[in-house]
Amino acid sequence: MRIIIDGDACPVIDLAESIAHKFNIELILFCDYNHDIKLNYGRVVKVDQSYQSVDMKIINFAKRKDIIITDDYGLASLALSKKASAINSKGKIYTDKNIDTLLMKRHINKKIRRAGGRHPTVKKRSKKNDEKFKINLIRLIKDIK
């Protein structure tokens, strides 16, 4: 088991790093060359800035029982297809039961935007999000071990 972070815009890097260290789990953060991210525990893998390059590198690197931290539904879906687990930065665990609905919502929202419409925006992060993330990441780790 490894924890893999889609690090380009991840607000829970520090939390994930401390939990990985606590459980002695390998931590790998992927980001493009425009980000200067340093970790005290784990390693950073930098990739080209091209479209989807971080996601493609992560999915090619991921394997069964890994935990992927991402807010990208497409990447989460691919992770699940590889029998890895996926969780977002607010602590929502992606599953085979909820990923199709999330992908459909994303598709519908994209169509609304293209037609000039608007849809509800993402709410500001809260301490509750951090707490839920911590609880659910630890739950995933314990379930996999």
Label each PLM-derived region with a short phrase:
Residues 2-145:
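Nuclease catalytic cores that cleave nucleic-acid phosphodiester bonds
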